[in-house]
């Protein structure tokens, strides 16, 4: 089997980063819910420590988001360059790969808009 083309690699990279970004947002929501639950619970002598740990985890997750955004932007740029070079080379990649690549560009741009 032939190795995947640069277009396929760039496409899967964008899709992976979009999924990664979505999972970080889901993790943020879960951490915020755990913090609210800890704030409302009383009587636990370990609550202060748990609260500190959850807040630290929340801040660490928030700190990762700008990096993921930058990676998505860079991967989108590379994918768009691969689409363009494929067009200039007379369409070496299959039509299906090009369609998937364009869909990935749309998903990546949508994810960037949602982050903003």
Segments predicted by a language model, with ranges:
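Long amphipathic alpha-helical coiled-coil segments
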Residues: 68-97
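Domain-scale macromolecular recognition modules
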Residues: 92, 97-116
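Short, charged, amphipathic alpha-helical segments
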Residues: 48-56, 95-102
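Non-transmembrane amphipathic alpha-helical segments
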Residues: 10, 14-17, 21-38, 61, ...
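Short, charge-rich amphipathic alpha-helices with coiled-coil/heptad character
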Residues: 1-13
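Short, Lys/Glu-rich amphipathic helical modules
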Residues: 35-54
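Amphipathic alpha-helical coiled-coil segments
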Residues: 56-76, 112-115
């Amino acid at each position: 089997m032939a190795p995947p083309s640069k277009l396929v690699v760039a496409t899967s990279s964008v899709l992976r980063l979009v999924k990664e970004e979505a999972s970080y947002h889901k993790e943020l929501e879960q951490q915020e819910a755990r913090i609210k639950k800890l704030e409302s619970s009383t009587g636990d002598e370990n609550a202060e420590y748990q609260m500190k740990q959850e807040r630290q985890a929340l801040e660490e997750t928030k700190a990762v988001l700008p990096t993921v955004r930058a990676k998505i932007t860079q991967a989108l740029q590379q994918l768009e360059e691969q689409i363009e070079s494929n067009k200039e080379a007379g369409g070496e990649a299959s039509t299906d790969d090009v369609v998937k690549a364009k869909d990935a560009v749309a998903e990546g741009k949508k994810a960037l808009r949602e982050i903003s």
